Amino acid sequence: PGPPVLLARREARAQLRAGLALPDRGRLWDLGAGTGSIGLEALRLRPQLKLLAVERRAGGAALIQANAARLAVKPSAVLETDALQLLAGDLPDGLAQPDRVLLGGGGPNREALLRAVLQRLRPSGIVVIPLATVEALALLRPLLEQAGLTVQVNQVQAWRGQPLSDGTRLAPMNPILTLKGTKS
């Protein structure tokens, strides 16, 4: 795999944070954290959260730690490892059962990773999954429903102003599709 992806667009970050309905305290997992932007912003908004950020790509943990220092926040754990393997073993102290999960990674193992997350998700917990395709939605939504979670699907599209010779036009950005499950 290549270097960590760039920061998620601000419109996507805002939608994902809103979907997480961040509590004042609790445990947040950011799996497939990339640069850590969403988890670190959540920690900045809710400093009492315990954040576990996981990114498997080489250099990912160092980048997340550097971004955390820049934002003056302290994640509980930043790990450069495969999230599915991590969840199959022992997790760092106090982080074994999340209240909120942002599942941004998983690649071809995303279905197995979601199953592992659902086994550890606390009652009233929320999992939010950004999706690039409707096929991914068709694959993952039934897992949330079969586990008895309340499911929401959202799509948001933003437009940004682009200069024209005599004004500004609105250029559409790719839509942002999210799948959210809330455990009862």
Model-derived regions, located:
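Short beta-strand element of Class I
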Residues: 48-52
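Conserved SAM-binding loop of SAM-dependent methyltransferases across substrates and taxa
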Residues: 35-47
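S-adenosyl-L-methionine
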Residues: 54-95
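Conserved acidic E/D residue at the C-terminus of a beta-strand in Rossmann-like folds
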Residues: 54-55, 102-104
